Amino acid sequence: NFLIPGIMEQVERTGVHSGDSICVYPAQHLTQAEIDTMVDYTGRFARELHVTGLVNVQYAVSNGKVYVIEVNPRSSRTVPYISKVTGVPMVDLAVRCCLGEKLTDMGYGTGLHPNAPYVAVKVPVFSFEKLHGVDTQFGPEMKSTGEVLGIAPNFHDALLKGLIGAG
């Protein structure tokens, strides 16, 4: 069994480090077919890699086709974010699974967890004005020094809260 707490959508183009990208939960621009493909692929990866615990999968979508960027069988900086916005205690569940418990015995189903009734936007924080001489061009190397979270009933308001919080 596997549980996907939620799917986040990166706003910036592919190639920008995910830590430097604005991310939104739930994803705003994916079709149901694309979501179904991601859930299917993620389940296959988890089974084939014999994952017990956490796995982070990053996808890119172009013209309706889903591409795998990377599969990381470990925790990442997205774990506290997605745990917070979905209410799914990922670290606790992962540890309990590693100790032999089943997701279903802990009250969780398998597959994609239902979306929360709000939108959450993670906005990176940059300290370029304090770090002189730092390359400010976005790319695969992370430049942000923190992040904030905006939560609201819709994307516009959640993004606005995040941008205000990021300064």
What are these model-derived regions, one by one?
Residues 1-167:
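ATP-dependent carboxylate activation and anion-phosphoryl transfer catalytic cores
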